[in-house]
């Protein structure tokens, strides 16, 4: 195996360990739900992968919500998911998804928890919360909670039309 592949496998393993540590520390229980299911989630924009008479899950969401309904409080799962017709450099039919739920926790608390574990995992795995993505430097610790209403209040609608017509768009195939 070449050095690049080995490095990526090690980074992936370290990342999953760091994420799990964050969830365990926060009192979450790791669960594992079936990958092969009888019926796909009814999402018109997500195409399921057939597996004989059944389907491969597109997300563990439904099975995890059953666990919440059964009384589980804080659960997470890292595991394989499948979506048909996903292809390209950044999309594959099979991928790994992190899904988590905390019953009774508000969306703002969940957003803050997410920002915290993302920054902590980056620091542990990469030694920094600063990453480069799409040619830009991003500081994962510089989390800012933004609401749609808050952004609308900050928007200069006088320049909105000008901004819209001056934007350059291109189709990506």
List where the protein language model places each region.
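Class II aminoacyl-tRNA synthetase catalytic cores and aaRS-like
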Residues: 1-173
């Amino acid at each position: 195996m070449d050095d690049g592949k080995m490095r990526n496998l090690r980074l992936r393993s370290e990342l999953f360990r760091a994420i799990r540590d964050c969830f365990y520390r926060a009192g979450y229980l790791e669960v594992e739900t079936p990958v092969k299911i009888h019926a796909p989630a009814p999402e018109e924009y997500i195409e399921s992968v057939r597996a004989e008479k059944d389907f491969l899950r597109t997300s563990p969401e439904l099975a995890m919500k059953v666990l919440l309904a059964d009384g589980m409080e804080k659960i997470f799962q890292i595991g394989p998911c499948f979506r048909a017709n996903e292809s390209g450099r950044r999309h594959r039919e099979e991928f790994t998804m992190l899904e988590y739920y905390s019953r009774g926790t508000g969306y703002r608390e969940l957003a803050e928890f997410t920002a915290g574990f993302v920054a902590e995992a980056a620091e542990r795995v990469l030694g920094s919360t600063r990453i480069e993505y799409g040619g830009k430097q991003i500081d994962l610790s510089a989390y800012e909670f933004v609401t749609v209403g808050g952004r609308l209040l900050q928007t200069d609608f006088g320049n909105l039309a000008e901004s819209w017509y001056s934007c350059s768009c291109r189709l990506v195939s």
